[in-house]
Amino acid sequence: MSMPVPQVVEVFAPAKINLTLHVTGQRPDGYHLLDSLVAFADVGDVLRLEPADVWQMKTVGPEAEAVPDGAENLVLKAAALLDGAPKAAFTLTKNLPVASGIGGGSADAAAAFRGLCAATPHHDPNNIDTQRRLLSLGADIPMCLHCVTARITGIGEEITPVAQFPALHAVLINPRVAVSTPAVFKAMKQRNNPPMPDIPPESCDVKDLVEWLRAQRNDMQEAATTLEPAIATVQAALEGHRACQLARMSGSGATCFGLFHTAQAAQQAARDLSRDYPQWWIRPTQLGSQAERAVPRLS
């Protein structure tokens, strides 16, 4: 019988942003092969773990209504995969829209795993077997464990960190539509696309990086836009802002990101677009590694 977590733990679960997403094939088991440059935002959900005799789950916050309850919740599914995990009462403050292409549910599952491992040091978050089991819950979960800028290959399990990646100032927009990842994959016309070229060297500045990103793709965007035309409206709104350097969809959508030269420009764009589209979820952010912020805090 496992004991409750010995302390209160709070974990930040940052949004995951696919700066690029090349779909390069499909395995016989149906999983798609990816080649993606991923960064993490300084906006996200917050998961709190408190001692309990049985697993408990409560969701609060502005996006709580759309989160599934009970056994279908990814937080509880991830916790159940950790052998002998201490019991906890989870409180998830849900700030990210669900089914939005920015890894919200996967980030929450990874946060639960990190929190439980921090509360019981004999559990290793880098255990390969456990990470493999987490992958069965979602291809984004392993990358969300580390929260570092990385090149992601395979089906999501091959993670190559990108050192000294420059901070990118961005605006995230979701048009308040949920998109099914399996539906987008099903709608794709081409699954065997070219992989990414080499990522620019560490000495690359932001201007050169944006130029390189402009030459890359999100191979899921066309299919996602066919299913949800609002994605095209979001991208056009971002591209129409005078300061936007690049706009693209993240993941399977419907969230898009726009890159801006400075934090001030991103904040101004967020204000302008929020005024023009008050029904959308819009956040200014900085993209890069969030590994330090994602470290669980014990109290």
From Swiss-Prot:
Top EC class for this record: transferase
What InterPro entries is this protein classified in? GHMP_kinase_C_dom, GHMP_kinase_C_sf, GHMP_kinase_N_dom, IspE, Ribosomal_Su5_D2-typ_SF, Ribsml_uS5_D2-typ_fold_subgr
> Which keywords does the record carry?
ATP-binding, Isoprene biosynthesis, Kinase, Nucleotide-binding, Transferase
Answer yes or no on keyword DNA-binding: no
Query: Biological process (GO) annotations?
Result: isopentenyl diphosphate biosynthetic process, methylerythritol 4-phosphate pathway; terpenoid biosynthetic process
GO MF annotations, alphabetized: 4-(cytidine 5'-diphospho)-2-C-methyl-D-erythritol kinase activity; ATP binding
The UniProt entry, under SUPFAM superfamilies, shows: GHMP Kinase, C-terminal domain (SSF55060), Ribosomal protein S5 domain 2-like (SSF54211)
Reaction catalyzed = 4-CDP-2-C-methyl-D-erythritol + ATP = 4-CDP-2-C-methyl-D-erythritol 2-phosphate + ADP + H(+)
Q: What is its EC number?
A: 2.7.1.148
> From what superkingdom does this record's organism come?
Bacteria
Involved pathway(s): Isoprenoid biosynthesis; isopentenyl diphosphate biosynthesis via DXP pathway; isopentenyl diphosphate from 1-deoxy-D-xylulose 5-phosphate: step 3/6
- Whether Nucleotide-binding counts among this entry's keywords is yes
Binding positions for ATP per the UniProt entry: 97-107
**Active-site residues, record numbering mapped to chain:** 16, 140
Provide the function of this protein: Catalyzes the phosphorylation of the position 2 hydroxy group of 4-diphosphocytidyl-2C-methyl-D-erythritol.
Q: Which family does it belong to?
A: Belongs to the GHMP kinase family. IspE subfamily.
Q: What is this protein called?
A: 4-diphosphocytidyl-2-C-methyl-D-erythritol kinase
Biological source species: Roseobacter denitrificans (strain ATCC 33942 / OCh 114) (Erythrobacter sp. (strain OCh 114))
The gene is ispE
